[in-house]
Amino acid sequence: MKEEPKQKAAAPGLVYFHIPLPEFSSFTSSNFTGVKQEGISSPSINSGFFASMVEAGDVKAAFIGHDHVNDFSGKLNGIQLCYAGGFGYHAYGKAGWSRRARVVSVQLEKSDGGEWRGVKSIKTWKRLDDPHLTTIDSEVLWNRGSNGMTFSCRVCMTVNP
């Protein structure tokens, strides 16, 4: 049996939970992508969970739900904080605002010999539940540079398939 190669560095972490952290209130309309159409329903007590994610150093993005007509994403202390947007029809929404789901895509590197390597990039976008299943707000959350260094950037655009 062939021994698997050891992981050289921590993989970029992605965190998923339902209730937004108080830090989601840190954004203004000038420093996020997407829309904020209702208040942030976070706990009144800050548990320190966000500070723990920052301290861990490997968490690149956190994804939450709860506030169904918010779908924004913004970066705070090196971590992209992303609302999922309301998708289901079993809960509240906003008339005229298409239901949407946030998609997260993680691309892995492959060696010349076809072996899987580390994570190459993490991207996200939202898919609307409209007649065209429109893709909006595409962003690169994280990627590995050609020199092995990591960097993050934001690219915001609307793409129709």
State each model region's role.
Residues M1-D71:
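His/acidic metal-ligating clusters that form di-metal
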Residues G34-S41, S47-A56, N70-P161:
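Binuclear metal-dependent phosphoesterase catalytic core
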